Amino acid sequence: AFDMMYRLLDGLTLPLPRPLRPMTDVIVGNPRPAWLIDAALRIAPRFSADLAWKLQQARHLTGLSKPSEVLRALGAFTMEPLEGLIHQPCLVLAGDADQYVPFERLEDVRRALANAASLDVRVFHEAEDPDMAQHCQIGDLNRAFTIMGDWLSGQQPRSGA
């Protein structure tokens, strides 16, 4: 996985304080507050360039314009229905300084890939390896692609889940 995106909606909710993140599930699952979501997300991007960019990208990805529709669409993209159904060897790269994917999702990814033929998880920590700890290991793509190439060619030992 390049990157370990368990749930696409996480990209928008990561900047929220951790206690508020679960509330997005309620909002995404309930169509009634759509007008409130749309109003709030017309204002909020003015205070956060990161949120503004992420909403713009989400609109582009989904082809939708209303924030409430975008949130519902992103909420549908999750690995949850695939849990236990993936059986091929898997490589997962994860960094604890990822701007879009909460690092704590790694355990969800491991659970989803529990039946993989093999699971090789490479974890990068900002304190030791700041370039590789970023989203999609963007700080050192050559190294990231080398890791993937070596893994695909069997030059790296594959570890179990």
Language-model regions: role of each:
Residues 125-161:
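Catalytic active-site module of serine/aspartate enzymes centered on a nucleophile-bearing elbow/loop
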Residues 99-105:
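Conserved alpha/beta-hydrolase "acid-adjacent" motif
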Residues 2-3, 93-95, 124:
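Generic beta-strand/beta-sheet core signal
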Residues 86, 109, 148:
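Hydrophobic, well-ordered secondary-structure elements that form the walls
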Residues 1-64:
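Alpha/beta-hydrolase-fold enzymes
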Residues 106, 110-132:
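Catalytic histidine neighborhood in serine/cysteine hydrolases
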Residues 64-82:
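Active-site nucleophile elbow and catalytic-triad environment of alpha/beta-hydrolase enzymes
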Residues 86-87, 92-94, 98:
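Short beta-strand/loop motif that positions the catalytic acidic residue
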